[in-house]
Amino acid sequence: MQSSTALLFLLLTVTSFTSQVLAHPGSIPTSCCFIMTSKKIPNTLLKSYKRITNNRCTLKAIVFKTRLGKEICADPKKKWVQDATKHLDQKLQTPKP
């Protein structure tokens, strides 16, 4: 009886920890980049960006979202990528009338 009670307690404990880990959305990256664009994207086509820095992704990247909704991975070390992110940051900070 004691061993079955201990086994049940252990099973419930493991189940509760597992559900907490699976319920935590921040532990799993939403996307990773495996291929980076080699071409510069004109600033006029860019709408926003996000940084991929999760340790589970093999490459650090910037994911640009275009005005047409397409997501494109780019190397954050490239000068044009840094310039584009600065441009988008400034554009988002500028108040619209």
Curated annotation (Swiss-Prot):
The keyword Protease does not apply. One of its GO terms (molecular function) is CCR3 chemokine receptor binding. GO terms for biological process: actin filament organization; branching involved in mammary gland duct morphogenesis; chronic inflammatory response; eosinophil chemotaxis; ERK1 and ERK2 cascade; immune response; learning or memory; mammary duct terminal end bud growth. Expressed constitutively in the thymus. Expression inducible in the lung (type I alveolar epithelial cells), intestine, heart, spleen, kidney. Keywords: Chemotaxis, Cytokine, Disulfide bond, Glycoprotein, Inflammatory response, Secreted, Signal. Belongs to the intercrine beta (chemokine CC) family. PANTHER family: C-C MOTIF CHEMOKINE 13, SMALL INDUCIBLE CYTOKINE A. This is Eotaxin. It comes from Mus musculus. The lineage of its organism: Eukaryota, Metazoa, Chordata, Craniata, Vertebrata.
